[in-house]
């Protein structure tokens, strides 16, 4: 069966919400035209043209009609395919740290080749000389401390060629669990200004505890850590200010030896009317045995156009090792974000491949996006890839890109309020306990307070690996989820399910053995969706859970990473499940990174590379948790991926439980006011309640209900949620704001135990388009909460207003409360 891997949104899944505001004229209806050999898609704000010349299809121009800018695309390739693997060495990487006079520079390269600068810092941040060199596996604070959770699988690796070699030690080997520290601490000679070492991950599978080298200064708080996240060359460079992740390209993009210029157009370029726009389509063929169907689409009301290519082999199977499908000739383009799958932007445009694992190459001529892969094309097996190019009016890049995402994402964003059992029942989850939870939530939230609960998610611990692959535990769920569903039906309740495509954590070896026993994967293989039988089994099992268990949400954990056959199959599984239920919510956790292009396929991703629940800063354990929650959202989403919509971030929700980290937060008391008010104002559509009903008071339920209702009433504007203020990890006041022409919201929080001030200008706070700054400059904000100390706040564009926040105070405002 042909795998049709779509990067476009399924028909009928376009957002029912009003469009995000476009800072320019209304784009209007799409049109297409042919003039000689040139075909064009256009509307009121843009046009894009392609030309058939000597039988070859090539781009010619992009015109921004709002500014009159014309971007010449002649010489750009529609696509480039790689037919040979990209050589990346043996998976070990040379890293260098140089303490220059003005800067501290980090460089890296495969086996010492093609060394590139991957990070730099002011030398003033690292005064004097380091005191220690630490090598091995350590936490992100360069400390020899273990992860609080699962130890993870055992592995081994090495730090080699350490130079200079303190105490004559040039290498360090380790073997141990992935999430446990193994560190060698060595003295650092005064006056030494550089360090180099080769880091070989070997079989180690850690993420945050990846093999690393770290220089540590006298105060113990100043440090610089450089770790290798994976064999593909993802690095984490961490200081006291936070973590940076980067995936530099040490060699040119995938070779791109088969270009679109080598393909001939079969017949003519077809103009196709769509239900809500216009499309162009052409069939292309090459003498290399690969055929392609190119398509360009401009939907009505769009400020962007999309292109897709469907690739297949005409005869014998064809190995594909890379795809480049965004070549935009616009000087000034830059990558926006530090993670894989970051878009390009500049010169009034944004662009990118709709693939979360893509990488960018920026040149003086413009920017290109590509990804390496290992895929086999055949007449029966084809793949579809997509790219986008759009307009970004001055000062409105974030909102312009958000508008594109909201129009094209896999499922329209909307609040998905649900219960998750992890910090309540933990591994003790079973049917009786889940039914008790459903009854309690139905009584306290649904009936008493009028708050709908969309799902009750069963997290890890529900299956019985010794009895089969992802089968319900015979003691915990004796009648299977179908029986549980029948008992939940009177409440109108649905189940959500945690499941791992790669087998999860505890019990993963047994699950793998079960798959091998059933012939789903080879006898010596690990779980991997690229095996057709296992993939089909996984799809069928998820469908069965949806059909028989009434499951309306999946939490895919340990999902895998990198553009591989498994990765491609994973995204296709999501597509297939949406064919059965377009509203199914798919949250992907471990194995993701904050590329906004995930959202073309799934609904939300986790703030990977931080603890699930952690504590930092001041106050009690609940306030420290809030500072951790928002601090790492700021670091891992806002800073690492400025164009990732915060409405699609997984934060680990509201926590008041008795299991695992939930117990520590729960012991801080049941005053949830600050937590729920700050959480529901962040715009997240994945609204998680990790609550133990027996620990809740009537007041606690009231706070949850009031904030959830407020968020649901402001769901439209909260899609625009964006960051305001400083860094919570530095105890700076911060918040979230959202704006559209109809509403605005603002949340502020002080993470310090001392009063702190924050300056607010409506222009900056609400990220206002230029026209709005003059047409509607004033904002009369009021609080929806009667007990809030500051009930009203007036802001104006171009005028700074100083607000003083009391210790740990949370303030929430909107433009329609009390009207």
Language model features with spans:
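Aromatic- and carboxylate-enriched substrate-binding clefts and catalytic-loop regions
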Residues: 453-656
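Conserved structural scaffold segments of CAZyme catalytic domains across common CAZy folds
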Residues: 86, 99-102, 259-496, 500-509, ...
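Beta-strand-rich N-terminal accessory domains
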Residues: 16-119, 161-163, 169-172, 196-204, ...
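Extracellular glycan-recognition surfaces and repeat-rich motifs
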Residues: 125-170, 249, 253-262, 266-268
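Secretory/extracellular carbohydrate-interaction modules
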Residues: 117-128, 132-135, 139, 164-236
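Solvent-exposed strand-to-loop "edge" motifs in beta-rich extracellular domains
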Residues: 196-204, 312-314, 749-751
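Active-site-proximal substrate-binding groove within the catalytic cores of carbohydrate-active enzymes
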Residues: 42-44, 55-57, 62, 380, ...
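Sec-dependent signal peptide recognition
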Residues: 1-6
């Amino acid at each position: 069966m042909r795998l049709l891997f779509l990067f476009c949104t399924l028909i009928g899944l376009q957002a029912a919400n009003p469009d995000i505001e476009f800072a320019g004229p209304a784009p209007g209806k799409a049109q297409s035209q042919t003039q000689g050999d040139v075909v064009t898609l256009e509307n009121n704000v843009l046009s894009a043209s392609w030309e058939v010349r000597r039988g070859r299809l090539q781009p010619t121009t992009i015109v921004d009609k709002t500014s009159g800018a014309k971007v010449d695309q002649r010489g750009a390739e529609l696509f480039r395919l790689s037919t040979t693997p990209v050589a990346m060495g043996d998976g070990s990487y040379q890293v260098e740290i140089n303490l220059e006079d003005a800067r501290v520079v980090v460089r890296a390269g495969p086996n010492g080749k093609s060394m590139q600068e991957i990070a730099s810092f002011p030398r003033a941040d690292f005064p004097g000389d380091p005191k220690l060199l630490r090598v091995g596996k350590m936490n992100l604070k360069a400390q020899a401390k273990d992860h609080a959770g699962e130890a993870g699988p055992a592995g081994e690796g090495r730090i080699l060629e350490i130079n200079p070699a303190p105490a004559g030690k040039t290498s360090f080997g380790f073997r141990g669990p992935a999430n446990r520290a193994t560190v060698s601490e060595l003295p650092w000679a005064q006056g030494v200004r550089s360090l180099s070492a080769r880091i070989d991950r070997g079989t180690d599978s850690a993420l945050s505890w990846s093999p690393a080298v770290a220089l540590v200064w006298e105060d113990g708080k100043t440090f610089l850590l450089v770790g290798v996240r994976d064999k593909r060359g993802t690095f984490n460079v961490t200081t006291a200010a936070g973590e940076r992740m980067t995936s530099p390209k040490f060699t040119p993009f995938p070779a791109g030896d088969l270009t679109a210029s080598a393909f001939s157009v079969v017949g003519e370029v077809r103009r196709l009317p769509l239900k809500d726009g216009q499309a162009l389509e052409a069939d292309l063929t090459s003498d290399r045995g690969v055929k392609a169907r190119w398509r360009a689409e401009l939907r009505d009301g769009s400020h962007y156009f999309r292109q897709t290519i469907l690739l297949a082999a005409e005869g014998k199977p064809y190995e594909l090792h890379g795809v480049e499908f965004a070549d935009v000739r616009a000087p000034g383009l830059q990558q926006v974000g530090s993670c894989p799958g970051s878009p390009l932007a500049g010169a009034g445009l944004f662009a990118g491949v709709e693939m979360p694992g893509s990488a960018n190459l920026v040149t003086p001529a413009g920017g290109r996006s590509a990804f390496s892969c290992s895929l086999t094309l055949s007449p029966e097996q084809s793949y579809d890839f997509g790219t986008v190019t759009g307009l970004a009016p001055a000062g409105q890049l974030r909102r312009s890109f958000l508008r594109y995402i909201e129009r094209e994402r896999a499922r329209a964003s909307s609040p998905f309020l649900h219960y998750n059992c992890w910090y309540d029942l933990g591994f003790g989850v079973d049917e009786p306990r889940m039914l008790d939870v459903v009854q309690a939530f139905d009584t306290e939230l649904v009936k008493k307070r009028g708050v709908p609960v969309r799902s009750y998610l069963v997290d890890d611990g529900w299956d019985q690996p010794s009895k089969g692959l992802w089968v319900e535990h015979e003691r915990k769920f004796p009648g299977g989820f179908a029986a549980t569903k029948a008992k939940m039906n009177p409440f109108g309740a649905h189940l959500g399910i945690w499941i791992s495509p790669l087998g999860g954590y505890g019990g993963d070896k047994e699950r793998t053995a079960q798959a091998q026993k059933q012939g789903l994967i080879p006898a010596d293989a690990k779980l991997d969706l690229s095996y057709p039988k296992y993939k089909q089994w996984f799809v069928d099992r998820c469908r069965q859970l949806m059909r028989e268990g009434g499951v309306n949400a999946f939490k895919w954990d340990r999902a895998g990473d990198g553009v591989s056959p498994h990765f491609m199959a994973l995204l296709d599984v999501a597509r297939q499940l949406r064919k059965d239920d377009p509203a199914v919510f798919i949250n992907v956790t471990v194995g993701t990174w904050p590329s906004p292009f995930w959202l073309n396929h799934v609904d939300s991703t986790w703030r990977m590379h931080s603890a699930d629940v952690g504590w930092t800063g001041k106050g009690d354990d609940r306030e420290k948790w809030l500072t951790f929650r928002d601090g790492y959202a700021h670091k891992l989403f806002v800073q690492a991926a400025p164009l990732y919509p915060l409405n699609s971030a997984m934060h680990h929700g509201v926590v008041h439980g008795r299991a695992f980290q939930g117990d520590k937060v729960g012991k801080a008391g049941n005053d949830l006011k600050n937590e729920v008010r700050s959480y529901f104002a962040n715009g997240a559509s994945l609204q998680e309640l990790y609550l133990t009903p027996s620990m809740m008071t009537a007041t606690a339920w009231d706070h949850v209900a009031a904030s959830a209702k407020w968020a649901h009433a402001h769901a439209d504007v909260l899609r625009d949620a964006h960051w305001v203020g400083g860094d919570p990890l530095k105890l700076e006041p911060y918040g979230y704001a959202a704006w559209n022409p109809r509403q605005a919201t603002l949340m502020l929080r002080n993470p310090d135990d001392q009063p702190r001030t924050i300056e607010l200008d409506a222009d900056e706070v609400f990220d206002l388009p230029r026209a709005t700054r003059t047409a509607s400059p004033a904002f009369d904000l009021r609080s929806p909460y009667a007990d809030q100390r500051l009930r009203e706040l007036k802001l104006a564009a171009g005028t700074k207003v100083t607000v003083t926040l009391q210790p740990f105070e949370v303030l929430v405002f909107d433009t329609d409360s009390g009207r």
